[in-house]
Amino acid sequence: LKGALHTSSTRIGYPLQVHRSRPAAEQGTVLFEDDELTVRCTPLTHRVPAYAYRVDQKPLAGRFDIDKARSLGIPPGPVYARLKRGESVTLEDGRVIDGTTLCGPERPGVSVMICTDTVFCDAAVELARGVDLLIHESTFAHAEAEMAFQKQHSTSTMAAQTAAEAGVGQLAITHLSPRYVPGNPVSPDDLLKEAQAIFPNTV
């Protein structure tokens, strides 16, 4: 990473923290976690080490009911931020307002998984279970499945099979071979249709 930044004369103005994928993937532990996100990864099936990464947003606070706050005579301002966080606040008139009474139910966070270079593998299916969006490589068309296995890349149908078996919300196929350009016998639209035949909610 340092070499790439140096060679490209890239300067970043924020702290960079490196997390090693291999130990977390092999042990099935969390790669990264903070107050908002959890990141996990798993090894894939490819000629060189490759990993899938899943990011889960933690549950979000319920929506703040501004109309209810106004009806209680709570003036807009910084106090709203505290109430949105569910804190109890003492107003200037002495009333104590419990912020949780002004917020709706907790909302689930969203989840995204990116599946880099791989042929179809069970590990990807397991990590992707129930994810909202699966971004999956789709290098080859189904007709070139033999080549996909040789090169350890996925076909459009393998990506769709992963999505279907994992019960994901939506599949986005990416990493298409440059051979599938408009005007060629097989185009990106053909790969999309192949995937949609197995998993309709594919883009």
Can you annotate each of these PLM segments?
Residues 12-17, 34-35, 109-110, 198-201:
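A short helix-to-beta-strand connector/capping loop
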Residues 17, 113, 170-172:
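A structural signal for isolated positions on well-ordered beta-strands in alpha/beta enzyme cores
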Residues 17-21, 40-42, 203:
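General small-molecule cofactor/ligand-binding pocket signal
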